[in-house]
Amino acid sequence: MFKPLTLIAASILAVTSFNAAANCDPGEIVIKFSHVTNTDKHPKGIAASLLEKRVNEEMNGKACMQVFPNSTLYDDDKVLEALLNGDVQLAAPSLSKFEKFTKKYRIFDLPFLFEDVDAVDRFQSSAKGEELKNAMTRRGVKGLEFWHNGMKQISANKPILVPADAKGLKFRVQASDVLVAQFEQIGANPQKMSFAETYGGLQTKVIDGQENTWSNIYGQKYFEVQDGTTETNHGILDYLVVTSSKWWDGLPADVRDQFAKILNEVTIERNAESNKVEELNKQYIIEAGGVVRTLTPEQRQQWVDALKPVWQKFEKDIGADLIEAALAANQK
């Protein structure tokens, strides 16, 4: 049965009606969690707020979590250094942000590899996906849980329906060699730019377009300074909740086990809701007057064919076995 948008929104917002950063008591282990999104409309922000609530209720006296959203403490380009320095204990950067720690996560940037978020979930839950969490252990970074955002769409200051429409345009990308290659493959000019700078870049026409999820496009108001957004679903934008191996190994066993259990339960609950949150943000954009375009099957196939060579370029870094496992995850 159809639910009014306001009722769906209310059910999602119900989990985010929490207090600001907690006041920790003496003797409690302080867990600072820095991230870059809002707290009430973004999958990561909602999950972080729920995690904070549960830790502070269920681990009261043992541990205390403080969440710092909207890049108020660190942006994703600096948070990993802060993590290794012990200035924060938890972060959840996008998987594209781990380039200097491992090349394995490049698999998540390959265009049109995953059919949908459910396929991503199956891959991350597989043995190969579990192995990826430990890909940075030697560098002092421990992966804990994968968090979903959603599939990426393309927006620009002109209509984009086929790859040729993007030729010559400047697109903001994360600091990922795969994403650079993706836009170069279709004749566009990729520009590495931080999340926080992207709206200004679009507004001042330093860049012409960008790729992102519905929640980021709505939450950062990119749709206000673009001609429209094309629903390409060409890639996944996900996060990895990480901590420093040193901090994690130094926790008392009971604290570590209880925290890991809570984090896993929050992950399962919120990942199951990610598609609903993304669809909600898409509708927010439409209701606000934003233009959303869809592709015909023939147009989509043009994108798939144009971007397939990117896979071959990075297969050696990623591993053919991982790519095969990802493709297998598309089979339900």
Swiss-Prot record:
Q: From which domain of life does this come?
A: Bacteria
Coiled-coil regions listed:
none
Q: Biological process GO annotation list? A: C4-dicarboxylate transport; transmembrane transport
Q: Which UniProt keywords apply?
A: Periplasm, Signal, Transport
Q: Where in the cell is it found?
A: Periplasm
Extract the signal peptide range: 1-22
| Regions crossing the membrane | none
Cellular component terms per the entry's GO annotation: outer membrane-bounded periplasmic space
What is the stated purpose of this protein?
Part of the tripartite ATP-independent periplasmic (TRAP) transport system DctPQM involved in C4-dicarboxylates uptake.
Q: Which family does the record assign?
A: Belongs to the bacterial solute-binding protein 7 family.
Protein's name in the database: C4-dicarboxylate-binding periplasmic protein DctP
Q: Which organism is it from?
A: Vibrio cholerae serotype O1 (strain ATCC 39315 / El Tor Inaba N16961)
List the lineage, top down.
Answer: Bacteria, Pseudomonadati, Pseudomonadota, Gammaproteobacteria, Vibrionales
Q: What is this protein's gene name?
A: dctP
